[in-house]
Structure formats: C-alpha cells, structure tokens
C-alpha cells in the first residue's frame, strides 16, 4: 500500500514546517486585507488623495510632510485619512471642533505610536492609559505646584546665564550659532537641577553628551520607524540595521537613567547615616522614590525608571525645541525682537534678577512666544485609538478601532481658523483678539483630559530664556541655511537652526 500525501509530508518535517509557515503567512495576509477593506468602508465619508496600493501616502513623508499639510487642509477642511503602507491608516484631524470632541474623550494612545515610544521611554505618563495613567499623574502632580515652580526660576536663570556666557566666548571667534545644540544642553542642565537636584553644570563638564546623542538618535529612528510600515513589526525592526542602532542607544539611555536613580538612592543612604537635620528641597525624583517605597505594588522599579526617562526627555527635548524655534522667530523678525527687548529691559533692567512676578508683566513677549508656538509647536501630533464610535459636529462618524492623529501643526496653520496662517503676527494673542480664538485651534501643550502636566514649567523656562537672551544678544537669521522643520518625536530642523548673535551694547 502506497503512503498517503499526509504520511509523505510527515516524513519530511522541513517541508511540513515550510507549509505551516506559508499557511500562517497566508492567514495573516488575509486578515490584514480584511482589515484594510473594513477601514476603507469605515472611511467612505472622508475623501483622501490617491494612495499607492503598497506604499500608501509615503511620498508625503518625511521631507514634504509640512508642505503637504497646507495643501491637504485646503482640499480636506476637517480631516483626511493617510495611509502608511497597505495596512496602516492614520485619520489626521486638523479641525478644532473635531479635536475638541476627541480630546474630551478617554481613548487610549494609538497602538503603533504607543509601542514605538514605549520601546525607549517606557511605560510612563506619556505612554500610559486608563487607571494606571491616573495613578501616575496623581503621584507626580505635587512636583508641579506653584510653590515648586517659583523655586525653579532661580535654577533656570542659572542655566540660561551659563549658556549665554558660553555664547560670548563662542562669538568672539564666530558669530554664527546653531541654536538647538546650545539650547538642548541648557534645558537638560535646567531639568537636571530642577527635577533631580544635580550639582554643578552639565554645560561645563559635558558629562551628558552621550545622553543627548542617544535621545537625538532614538527620536530620529522612532520617527523613521513610524513612517516605514515594515518596521511596525517588532521582529523585522529588531533585525534591521536601524533596529541594531536603536538597541545600542536605548541601552545607553537605560544605563544613564539607572545611574541617576542609583546615585540618588546612595545619597539618601549617606544622609540617613549622618543623621542630618538639615532640610533639603524635595524634587521630582524624591517624589517618585517616596511613591515607590510607600507602595511597591502600584509603583514598581520599572515605573520609577519609566517616569525618570519620561521627564528627562519631555523636560528638556520639548522645551529645547520650543525655545530654539522661538529664538529663531525673533531673529527672523527683528522689529518684534526689539519690541520684546525694550519691554524686558524696562521690566528687568540689566537682568541681574528675574522673579515669578516679572513673568506676568511682559505681555508683548508672551504674545510673541505664543505666536512662535503656533507656528512651530514642539509636539506635531497626538495619537488616539478610538475605543468606541464617534460622531463629529458635521454628522460624519467613525467606528471604534480607527487610529486618529490630532495634527497640532495643521490645527495651528488651518486657514479656516487663522487669517494668513503663515504670517508671524503676535497680535493674534492680544487680550481682545485672544477671545476670538477657538480654544482648540491653539493647543501647543495638548488640551482636555490629558493635557501636558509640565506646560507651566515649559512656559516659565521659555520666558526666562527669551528675557535673559534678548538682554544680552541681538539675533539675526542665517539666510544661507534656513531651517528645514522635521518631526523627530518633537519638532526639530533637519539642518539645524542657525542664527548670528551679536552682543547688545
């Protein structure tokens, strides 16, 4: 009796394995194809530009991303579906009424962006959802109350002055500056002093250069991964050349944050041994360590690591982006720069002292800062995965399961809500004009239930940096190297942000 085809197959396990793999692959392709058809049906009320069947709208990313948004908003006023590859779609929202409904809900972060950011930042406030997010936010909230923020102003001022001292040395040889490099080091110095009680100046000893390099590369690779649908798969990404580089920098980041935590634990042990009665200011890291010691079940070592990573990253990278673009705008528009300088000089004199009370007494400078944040919002978009259906004000609906991007850049440049959106006009934010702005048309720090917990910290640092910088330097743009905005988790420039600096007489 001849063996059956099944017996023949069983006699060749390698062939059986190949058949099994092909069957699983076919099953996955069918599943993805069915999901694609479901998404197309779900989005039939929302027209979109033609997409390649395999690459999707890849031609929009990343170089032409911001140019394309302007064209899309004219043709698709509220929102537009954008495809990344054949099976991944992001529903990009640029209408404030749409954004308002979305940001008042409690939908979780989108699966793809959540996974990519979590792979190096960890499960902290930026990536958490639900009850755990609420718990963590409650834990860190005391670190951002008004009394704490007032103390931070002195430390921020020290860091800014240190940066400006370095500028004086630099421009003696070369008046050209690349802002992001200098400002990033300054904001890291500031967050390390304010949140982690770091002694000394990072700007002088350059001990954190490796950390800055790691964050820069991890941000860049994360954005590239987001735009490459093949790299959405963890296994494919892990064995890619980018995945190998990512792993190296991620390890460096982890080692650094671990050292920050361990150093503080050792410092606290030493203080206990010395039985010192001298009171020390509690900082952000103290709050986290206290939460861990009091409730190890709800706040683990991994949670501690994640929040340290989150606040080191968010506390310096987003703020350095904001300050760099603000200084660039003021360099580009000298009449506004001079008006800010006059206002600050009248308020602060030589700038030897800047206090909490001063920050509310610079209205024109504040308007300029807001207009810069409108034009160059540090965070380009916010992602959500709809966990229940939604109906928008115009009657169109989406089912649960759709990934939504609230496109902050596009919201801030939407010609239906901003007159001449590309024009730098600080008077948009004057007292009388502010009342006319849709509350969800300007959201540089998000809005609604999950707004940025550190937004007041960021605004204070922006004001301190701008005030002290303009008192000492006149800035002018380097027209030979105009910046090229690019999204790398936060908004940066592909070729840096170059200006000329001249000492104020």
From Swiss-Prot:
Q: What is its EC number?
A: 1.14.14.1, 1.14.14.130
Q: In which tissues is it expressed?
A: Preferentially detected in breast carcinoma tissue and mammary gland, whereas only marginal expression is found in all other tested tissues.
User: Cytoplasmic side of the membrane: what ranges?
Assistant: 1-9
TM segments?
A: 10-30
Classification via CDD domains:
CYP4B-like
The Gene Ontology terms for molecular function here are: arachidonate 14,15-epoxygenase activity; fatty acid in-chain hydroxylase activity; heme binding; iron ion binding; oxidoreductase activity, acting on paired donors, with incorporation or reduction of molecular oxygen, reduced flavin or flavoprotein as one donor, and incorporation of one atom of oxygen
Q: What is this protein called?
A: Cytochrome P450 4Z1
Q: Which organism is it from?
A: Homo sapiens
């Amino acid at each position: 009796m001849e063996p059956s085809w099944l017996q023949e197959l069983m006699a060749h396990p390698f062939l059986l394995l190949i058949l099994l793999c092909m069957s699983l692959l076919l099953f996955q392709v069918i599943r993805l194809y069915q999901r694609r058809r479901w998404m197309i049906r779900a989005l039939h009320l929302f027209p979109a530009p033609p997409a390649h069947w395999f690459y999707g709208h890849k031609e929009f990313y990343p170089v032409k991303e911001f140019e394309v948004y302007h064209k899309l908003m004219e043709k698709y006023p509220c929102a537009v579906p954008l495809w990344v590859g054949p099976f991944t779609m992001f529903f990009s929202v640029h209408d404030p009424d749409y954004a308002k409904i979305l940001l008042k809900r409690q939908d979780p972060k989108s699966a793809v962006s959540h996974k990519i950011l979590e792979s190096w930042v960890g499960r902290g406030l930026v990536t958490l959802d639900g009850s755990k997010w609420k718990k963590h936010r409650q834990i860190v909230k005391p670190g951002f109350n008004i009394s704490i923020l007032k103390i931070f102003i002195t430390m921020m001022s020290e860091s800014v002055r240190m940066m400006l001292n370095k500028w004086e040395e630099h421009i003696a040889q070369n008046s050209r500056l690349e802002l992001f490099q200098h400002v990033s080091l300054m904001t890291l110095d500031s967050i390390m002093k304010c949140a982690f009680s770091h002694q000394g100046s990072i700007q002088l000893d350059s001990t954190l250069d490796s950390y800055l390099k790691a964050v820069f590369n991890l941000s860049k690779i994360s954005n590239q991964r987001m735009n490459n649908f093949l790299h959405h798969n963890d296994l494919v990404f892990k064995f890619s050349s980018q995945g190998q580089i990512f792993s190296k920098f991620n390890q460096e980041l982890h080692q650094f944050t671990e050292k920050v935590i361990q150093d503080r634990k050792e410092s606290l042990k030493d203080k206990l041994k010395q039985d010192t009665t001298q009171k020390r200011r509690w900082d952000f890291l103290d709050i986290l360590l206290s939460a861990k010691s009091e409730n190890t079940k709800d706040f683990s070592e991994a949670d501690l690591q994640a929040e340290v990573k989150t606040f080191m990253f968010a506390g310096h990278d987003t703020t350095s982006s904001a300050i760099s673009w603000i200084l660039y705008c003021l360099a580009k528009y000298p009449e506004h720069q001079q008006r800010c300088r006059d206002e600050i000089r009248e308020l602060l004199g030589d700038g030897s002292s800047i206090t909490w009370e001063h920050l509310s007494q610079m209205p024109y400078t504040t308007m300029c800062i807001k207009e810069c944040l409108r034009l160059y919002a540090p965070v380009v978009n916010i992602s959500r995965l709809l966990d229940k259906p939604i109906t928008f004000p115009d009657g169109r609906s989406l089912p649960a399961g759709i990934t939504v991007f609230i496109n902050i850049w596009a919201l801030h440049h939407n010609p239906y809500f901003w007159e001449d959106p590309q024009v730098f006009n600080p008077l948009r934010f004057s007292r009388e004009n502010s009342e006319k702005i849709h509350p969800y048309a300007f959201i540089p720090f998000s809005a609604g239930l999950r707004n940025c917990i550190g937004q007041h910290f960021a605004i204070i640092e922006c004001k301190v940096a701008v005030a002290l910088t303009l008192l000492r330097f006149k800035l002018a743009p380097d027209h030979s190297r105009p910046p090229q905005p690019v999204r790398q988790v936060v908004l940066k420039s592909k070729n840096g942000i170059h200006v000329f600096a001249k000492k104020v007489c």
